[in-house]
Amino acid sequence: ANAPLRAADGPTPPGDPQKWPGTGPAWDGEHFQNRRNPFWSERQKDQGAVVWFGDSITEGWRTLDRDFPQLKTANRGISGDCSRGLLFRLKEDVLDLKPTGLVLLIGINDLASGAQPTDVAHNIRRIVDGFRAARPGVPIIVCHIMPWKAQPGEHTQRIKQTNALIDALMLGRPKVKICDTFGAFALPDGTAPKDLFPDLLHPNDAGRVVWRNTLAPVMYELGMLKDGAHL
């Protein structure tokens, strides 16, 4: 039986985001707390879920239960969040659920705010380390930062650099796999396809089908899905 969760009125207030773990930009806001309050009330219901953890790209995936009927899922995406925000809320929003898997996508808001690729990649490493320490042997999927904008430029190189650093930091870790959600979407010049990213940042429903189909074989390889071909 699950031990009762810590009695409290709600999630830990964010305080000064500059004091959060990690390096690089950090912020909270009204939406941050408005999302975290329901997360708190859903803690018992979501025990043992596979948790999707990230920013608005994750928050917008509102059909996880339908798209992954084999799994109990929990969406812990917050629009506008950065990697330091995920470090701050890792315990209460994810680890307290005793999750059976993690699907992590974060970093575009960091890069858009001037973060260095090394900051983002090392914050992601800290998220993975924190999850692994609390949940030994539980599978982790780290998604590549997706393409952004219609014109290639410095931002394209920073995304590619960050993804390469993530690959290097995750290499050889047991039960940790990369999901190439950059390569699955990017046009040859590294930009976002407008048919799947109408605002050139967030995937639409058709884009989420591609994301699901890119995740599925990785989840199958990790034993999270029993059949990688038929969700």
Model-derived regions: residue spans:
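Sec-exported extracytoplasmic/periplasmic mature domains
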Residues: 91, 95, 107, 129-136, ...
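N-terminal secretory targeting modules
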Residues: 1-53, 58-68, 133, 172, ...
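Solvent-exposed, acidic/flexible segments
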Residues: 50, 79, 83, 87, ...
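Charged, glycine-enriched surface loops/patches
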Residues: 121-143, 161-176
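Catalytic His-Asp segment of secreted/periplasmic serine-dependent ester chemistry enzymes
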Residues: 147-231
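Oxyanion-hole/transition-state-stabilizing segment in secreted/luminal serine hydrolases
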Residues: 53, 58-74, 83-125, 130, ...
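Acidic/histidine-rich helix-loop elements
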Residues: 18-27, 69-84, 112, 200
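Short, glycine/acidic-enriched loop or turn micro-motifs at the edges of active sites
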Residues: 58, 80, 183
